[in-house]
């Protein structure tokens, strides 16, 4: 089947909304391959950041965490690999690959890697 859709990549500003142009524009890629685990660390990579929000990949080593905090906007967390615990307003949720949770704006939340854990965080303003 012939693809009649034509997309001119040269018409796209390759750095618009993409930090450091490290992520392909109009090309497929694997989210889990774009962020690697580091011993004793939380690694994050911003995929998109602009005035309307941001999309960030995270890789947590086992036992690592993001301490309790609030955010001014709703966010959705999607688990890409491993198992993590998300605590929202004191309530604990264990999430595994393929599961997601919405964290409401201005509500205290934290993330803990119960084992090595990769997630995609999308925050929309």
Where are the predicted features?
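A cytosolic small-molecule/anion-sensing beta-strand core signal
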Residues: 80-81, 96-97, 115
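Ligand-binding loop in jelly-roll beta-barrel domains
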Residues: 105-125
């Amino acid at each position: 089947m012939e693809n009649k859709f034509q997309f001119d990549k040269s018409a796209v500003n390759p750095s618009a909304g993409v930090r450091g142009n490290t992520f392909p524009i109009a090309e497929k890629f694997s989210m889990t391959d774009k962020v690697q685990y580091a011993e004793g660390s939380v690694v994050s990579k911003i995929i998109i950041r602009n005035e309307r929000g941001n999309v960030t990949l995270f890789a947590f080593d086992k036992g690592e965490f993001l301490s309790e905090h609030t955010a001014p906007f709703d966010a959705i967390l999607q688990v890409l690999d491993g198992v993590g615990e998300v605590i929202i307003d004191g309530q604990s949720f264990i999430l595994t690959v393929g599961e997601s949770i919405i964290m409401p704006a201005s509500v205290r939340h934290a993330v803990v890697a119960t084992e090595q854990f990769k997630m995609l965080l999308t925050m929309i303003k």
